């Protein structure tokens, strides 16, 4: 059989001319809702030596099984996840990620995509999904089309059934974009910039002005250090970088980090955030700086 979920049973005794035999094939449907098609291969001393049987059908999942495997409720469309993490993709590279859904209604639905960022192609398959069957959403990302280095957060708006375009649901999307340095030659590496910061831990005092300075240096021997991006995912911090966006060899540049007091944790917990510095340093393209603050 083509998978462990399909079990054939048969008599191994030789079959005389004109005689018949029974082959029983069972499909284990537990935890596998939706359409299935499995192959069973019969090998014998015949011509041709191999025959193929197909077992197919649709498994209508029990409510508890559907709720466990597709817990996200998009109306008639049940999704396996409420967000899609595309992971890391390099510039000049592409990547595909898939997630599954299930038609939990009693009618055929035709899911469509009402919105996706320009750098992402989202395709539902199949176009029409009968009741009790699954669909696949493919996410195709081109690293050159994503606008920012590092983390990019966006969303995709799904219409579960094109006959009701007013019903829409949102899937959160994230992708982490970096430069591909895998083909940098030794001669270029010797002249490459080298990024360094004066500290990878910054504590902002609450009784001051709420600012800190991170000093970025280029310790390389040739090329300028290009600042691809400096950012934080914390709403309690703001960062600003030099307008030139580059640091010559042997020079430094200041990155200003400001605390947004009104965005600090309301329960009094200390701030523990990260600032990411992305450059064209092929050895250390990303430097992570921890920023803390404890304000009563």
Regions found by a protein language model. Name each.
Residues 28, 43-47, 142, 159-163, ...:
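Beta-strand-rich extracellular modules
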Residues 45-102, 161-221, 281-296:
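Long, low-complexity ectodomains and other extracytoplasmic segments of secretory-pathway proteins
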